[in-house]
C-alpha cells in the first residue's frame, strides 16, 4: 500500500521529553513530504500551540494540515483556510465553571495567543501555557471574560482528585459533550463527537483520500480513535497499554525517534 497521509500526535509522539522534534525526525519528515506524502498534526493543543511545530516541518511549503483542539478545528496550513470548526455550546459554561470552582481547580480556555484563567499562578496552568508557548491572561471572572466562540475548555488539577471529577462530569455531560483526560492533570471538555478520527474523516473527504491511504501515530487515549480508524495505526513504545493493544504496529519510543523509525519502515523503504 502506498500511504499518502501521515497523521501525528505531538506530545509523547512527534516530540521528545523536552517537547522538541529531534533533527533525525525532522529530516525524515521533510524527506517524506518531498516524496509527496502529506502530514497532518493532530493534537489537543490550540492552534497557536501547534503552529511552531508546523513551521519547523515546513507544512506551509508542503501543503500540510493542522487538527487543533483534538479535531475541533482543521486548518489547511498552506492557505491558512479554516476547513472545519466545531464550537463549544456556551450554555454549558456555567456548569463547567462551577465544577472547577467547587474543587478549587483552575479552568482555562484560549483567545488567540492567550490562555485565559482566573488562576494564573496555578502550576498546571503554567504547564499548559509553557507547553503551547502561550501567554497567560488573568481574568477576574471567567464567565464574563469568555464571550467569544471557543473550541474547548480545560480543567486542570491534582490527578487523583481530577479523576473523581472526571467521573462525575462524564455522567452529567456524556450526552452533551466530550469529557476525557489528555494528561493525568488535564481534563478536556470539548463539543460532543469531537475526536481525531471524526475530524480525519472530514479531512480525507476534503482532500480526496481514503483511510486506507493514511498512517496515524500516537501514544495517548485521545489517539485511540485515529489509530483504530487509520489504514495503518501505529502506537509509540511509550504509549498507554490500551493504545498499544489496538495498534497494527508498535514503533520505538518518542525518546528513540519512533516517528522517524515508522516513517522509514512504512513510507521510505
Language-model segments: residues:
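Short active-site oxyanion
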Residues: 36-40, 64, 152, 212, ...
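Residue-level signal for inorganic ion chemistry
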Residues: 32, 43, 70, 153, ...
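Short, structured coil segments at secondary-structure junctions
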Residues: 62, 70, 172-175, 229-230, ...
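Mg2+-dependent phosphoryl-transfer enzymes with acidic/Ser/Thr/Gly-rich catalytic loops
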Residues: 1-5, 22, 188-269
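Active-site phosphate-binding/coordination module
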Residues: 23-123
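Conserved acidic, metal-coordinating active-site core of Asp-based
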Residues: 99-217
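Hydrophobic packing residues within well-ordered alpha-helices of enzyme cores
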Residues: 25, 50-54, 165, 169, ...
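Asp-based phosphoryl-transfer active-site loop
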Residues: 2-18
Amino acid at each position: 500500500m502506498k500511504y499518502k497521509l501521515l497523521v501525528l500526535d505531538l506530545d509523547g509522539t512527534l516530540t521528545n521529553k523536552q517537547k522538541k522534534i529531534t533533527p533525525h525526525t525532522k529530516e525524515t519528515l521533510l524527506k517524506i513530504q518531498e516524496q509527496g506524502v502529506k502530514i497532518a498534526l493532530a493534537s489537543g493543543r490550540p492552534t497557536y500551540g501547534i503552529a511552531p511545530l508546523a513551521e519547523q516541518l515546513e507544512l506551509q511549503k508542503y501543503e500540510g494540515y493542522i487538527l487543533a483542539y483534538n479535531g475541533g478545528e482543521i486548518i489547511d496550513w498552506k492557505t491558512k483556510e479554516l476547513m472545519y470548526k466545531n464550537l463549544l455550546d456556551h450554555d454549558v459554561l456555567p456548569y463547567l465553571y462551577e465544577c472547577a470552582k467547587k474543587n478549587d481547580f483552575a479552568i482555562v480556555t484560549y483567545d488567540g495567543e492567550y490562555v485565559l484563567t482566573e488562576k494564573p499562578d496555578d502550576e498546571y496552568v503554567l504547564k499548559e501555557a509553557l507547553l503551547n508557548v502561550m501567554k497567560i491572561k488573568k481574568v477576574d471572572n471567567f464567565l464574563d471574560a469568555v464571550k467569544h466562540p471557543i473550541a474547548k475548555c480545560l480543567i486542570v488539577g491534582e490527578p487523583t482528585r481530577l479523576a473523581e471529577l472526571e467521573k462525575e462530569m462524564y455522567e452529567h455531560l456524556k450526552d452533551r459533550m466530550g469529557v476525557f483526560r489528555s494528561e493525568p492533570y488535564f481534563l478536556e471538555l470539548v463539543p460532543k463527537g469531537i475526536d481525531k478520527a471524526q475530524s480525519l474523516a472530514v479531512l480525507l473527504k476534503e482532500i480526496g483520500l481514503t483511510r486506507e491511504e493514511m498512517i496515524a501515530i500516537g501514544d495517548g487515549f485521545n489517539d485511540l480513535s485515529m489509530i483504530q480508524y487509520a489504514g495503518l495505526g501505529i502506537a509509540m513504545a511509550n504509549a498507554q497499554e490500551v493504545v498499544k493493544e489496538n495498534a497494527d504496529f508498535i514503533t520505538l519510543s518518542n525518546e528513540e525517534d519512533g516517528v522517524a523509525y515508522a516513517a522509514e519502515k512504512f513510507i521510505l523503504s
